[in-house]
Regions:
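Bacterial N-terminal signal peptides that target proteins for export
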Residues: 1-15
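Long, charged/polar, surface-exposed segments that mediate recognition or autoinhibition
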Residues: 115-161
Length: 207
C-alpha cells in the first residue's frame, strides 16, 4: 500500500473512533443529567417526617404550633406537663421526668430543637399537688392555635394588635380543666382570649 493510501486509512479510523466517542459521551450525559435533577421538595410535614415546611409563626401560621409540639414529642416522648408557654418562635414548658416523677424540669424549644433542661425547685409543694397540675402535652388541640389567633385579631380590631402568647395549663381547684389563654398587645390597648383545651372559644376581653 502506498504512503498516501495508509494516510487516508488512518484518517478514516480516527474519524470513526471520534464519532464513537461522541456517541458514548452523549449517552452518558443523558443519564447523568436525569440523575442530577433535584428531588421533589417534601412538604408533607407529617409527625414522622417534618419535611421542608418553614417553621412560621407558632401563634399565627396554620399548623406551626402543632409541628412544634410534634417535634418536642419526637425528642422527649408524650410527656406530662405543668404548663406550655408558646411564643411566636419558641416554646417554654415544664414537664415531669417520667423516670423520677418527683422531678419537674423546664425546657425551651427553639430553632427546631429542645434545649437542655433546667431543674425546677418545687420545695413546699406536695407530690399530689404537682400531679394535679399535670396534663398530657398531646391532649391539647394545638392545631386550633392559628385559628384562635385569627378570630382574636378579627374580633378585637386593636390598632397594632399582635398576638404574643398562648399559655396552656390547668390550675386546680379553681381551674380544673386544661385551658388556652392568649395575650395580644396593641398600640393603645391590650386584649386576652380564653379557650378550652380542645380549641373551643370561651371569652375575649379588651382592656
Amino acid at each position: 500500500m502506498t504512503r498516501r493510501g495508509r494516510a487516508v486509512r488512518s484518517i478514516t479510523v480516527v474519524v470513526a473512533a471520534f464519532a464513537l466517542l461522541l456517541a458514548a459521551c452523549s449517552g452518558s450525559e443523558t443519564y447523568s443529567g436525569s440523575s442530577d435533577l433535584p428531588a421533589p421538595e417534601d412538604t408533607t410535614g407529617s409527625p414522622e417526617n417534618p419535611g421542608t415546611i418553614p417553621q412560621g409563626n407558632f401563634l399565627t401560621t396554620p399548623g406551626a404550633a402543632q409541628r412544634a409540639i410534634d417535634a418536642i414529642v419526637r425528642e422527649l416522648g408524650p410527656r406530662r406537663v405543668r404548663y406550655v408557654n408558646m411564643y411566636d418562635s419558641y416554646v417554654i414548658f415544664e414537664t415531669q421526668d417520667p423516670a423520677k416523677p418527683e422531678n419537674i424540669d423546664r425546657y425551651t424549644y427553639r430553632d427546631g430543637r429542645v434545649g437542655d433542661f433546667e431543674p425546677v425547685n418545687v420545695s413546699g409543694q406536695l407530690q399530689e399537688d404537682i400531679e394535679a397540675d399535670l396534663f398530657s402535652i398531646t391532649e391539647v388541640n394545638w392545631g386550633a392555635i392559628a385559628g384562635l389567633s385569627e378570630t382574636f385579631l378579627a374580633q378585637t380590631e386593636l390598632e397594632g394588635g399582635t398576638v404574643v402568647l398562648a399559655s396552656v395549663e390547668r390550675n386546680p381547684p379553681y381551674q380544673p380543666d386544661v385551658r388556652i389563654d392568649m395575650a395580644m398587645n396593641g398600640t393603645r390597648r391590650n386584649a386576652s382570649l380564653q379557650a378550652a383545651g380542645d380549641g373551643t372559644l370561651q371569652n375575649i376581653r379588651v382592656y
